Amino acid sequence: MNFATWAYRHSRSLLSLFAVLAIAGAACSLWLPVALFPQVSFPRVRIDLDAGDRPSERMAIEVTTPVEESLRSIPGVRTLRSITSRGNAEIFINFDWGEDMIAAFLQVESQINKVLPILPAGTTFNVIRMDPTVFPVIAYSITSDRRPLTELRDLAQYTLRPALATVPGVAQVSVQGGQIEEYRVVVDLAKLRSFGMTFDDVANALSASNVLIAVGRIEQYGKLYLMISDTRFQTFEDIGKTILKSGPDGTIMLADVATIEQSDEPQWIRVTADGHDAVLFQVYQQPGGNTVQIAQGIKAKLESLRNQIPEGVHLASWYDQSSLIIASNLSARDAVVIGVGLAGLILLLFLRNWKVTLFAAIAVPSVLCATVLLLYVLKMSFNIMTLGGLAAAVGLIIDDTIVMAEHIIRRVRERKAKATQGVVLEAAAEFTRPLIGSSAATIIIFAPLAFLSGVTGAFFKALSLTMAASLIISFLIAWIALPVIATRLLSAKDAQFDDSGRLTRITHSLYRRFMSRLLRTPILVVFVILPLVLVGFLAFKNVQSGFMPVMDEGGFIIDYRAPPGTSLTETDRLVRQVEAILQTLPEVQTYSRRTGLGLGGDLNEANQGDFFVRLKPGPRRGIEEIMDDLRTQVGWQGSTLQEAWSWISSSLINIAAMPLRP
């Protein structure tokens, strides 16, 4: 008993198995995470260090250097790089690809905790694994013409941030920009010295007077009372009443030697949006989170908080990753629908049999659903690589379906068999070797992409696995399921076929004449192919190359740098000239700008920063044309800024894989 006979005898079981796989895949498509990129763990860790307002020289000696020396002892560290500025430092550690980054992350935290006691008091740190989740999935700006920046920051920090952090899948919500309210103590040095005191005495007195500590407990009448001492300042006047010195000659209070002023904390960054000083908040997702669901949850939560947002405060979304993902999903859906429609049309035109056309309508969705089931088992996600693989595989799936269906129906009509079962199974057996060769050749092309190293391999592994899986499943369905379905659908009536149809006659006639002339003068083939090979080679040598394809993502990023030594105020003045140009472009919907701070939250000098420009949806000029126009207008101004223009997706990868610098 050969395989074809065995398959026919177990046709119900096989069809049930394929149906279960397809239905399970369709169900898994609802649970599969949705993201822009595959979940890639780059062999890179970033450490953010904060030590108050120390000058950069002291920061490098007292904080950065000890931490670096401690981190060098971690096994697997390949390179180590640091950036130090006033009160802050960033350290980037690169490991080898394939390193266990969870273990490396824990080792980094352990080493910093070991060295933390010798660092200046109050030093804090944050260790971040670099992966696609370091880029926000959705971000908003808060601006107002009537509210101060301190109020806007408090709104973001204490109202919006805690509420948005409760949305399922959200890892954290960060706030940038604005002003932080503080009280400034201006000491009269002459008066202070006249009382025989120093600045340290003032600082120590303020620290000791503004505390909340537990002092013990009392058990009484069967109850336990926890005692605390709360001497925190409650009013503006409480600060001035702080006792600096007490003795026989009297008590000296802070108000006797200093003036207390209400002020704002010094800021070393500038953040704007749409031409106004702004506060930005970014939402980051957990690894493996569903980006589309998170974005929908954030929008719903903000809508529910609308009554808590003061009048005159404007919220604008300057980035929404879910919009690009939804567009990718729609493109993949369109590719499937168009592919199935064209395949059905071709089969109907040339074979003129609706039953054979039904094969394509069954095979393509079944293969894609079964592939989605495999993606779910492998804990992958819907992203531009897997969706691209599914869309690219549609044509190959249809090819397997068409050639098998055409071969079966041709054999049935040639034999003019009254009982088609034996003919169908025989035709399927005849076509097994060509089908195996065709599928294997294509799989061999894409399978090696899964073994590439570095960033390329990390991304193309998802594409390779998706295409290889879909082609293997397509082969199995074309080899097993289609013949079984054909034995049940095709009848003796389908063996009757009149090949005198007009389209068939025209096609056969043109093909015979063309091939007859070509075979009489085979040298023509050489003369036609050689120029094509030459043109292809020249195109290959001159075509531009890049990691990510150029696509309209609805926005772009401008990194800029002023001449070295430029102050924050001067850089801000230069950048506002670019903002003025941005506001004149009709295609710009909104934008955000950072100076002294990076898009990924990394440190920048006072003369560096970036723009994130979001364009309006709908009909408009191409994104490259808009960028060229803006670049030209900025150049006409004679600006001293150096700019680097980039796509959103490439910037995301650069932030995670290496710091992007203009």
Task: Please describe what each predicted stretch is.
Residues M1-L15, R415-E426, V455-K461, I480-L530, ...:
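Interfacial helix-loop-helix hairpins and adjacent transmembrane helices
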Residues W318, I325, N329, A405, ...:
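Helix-loop junctions and hydrophobic alpha-helical segments within the transmembrane domains
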Residues T123, V394-I408, T432-F451, A458-D498, ...:
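Transmembrane alpha-helices and their membrane-interface boundaries in multi-pass membrane transporters
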Residues L524, I529-Q633, I648:
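Juxtamembrane segments of multi-pass membrane proteins
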Residues A35-P38, Q321, V372-G389, A450-M467, ...:
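Short helix-loop junctions at transmembrane helix boundaries
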Residues M1-G341, L349-F350, K355-T357, F382, ...:
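Membrane-proximal extracytoplasmic
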Residues M1-V34, A429-F431, D498-M548, D628, ...:
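Signature of alpha-helical transmembrane segments and their immediate interfacial
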Residues G25-W31, L36, H314, G341-R410, ...:
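Hydrophobic transmembrane alpha-helices and their membrane-interface caps
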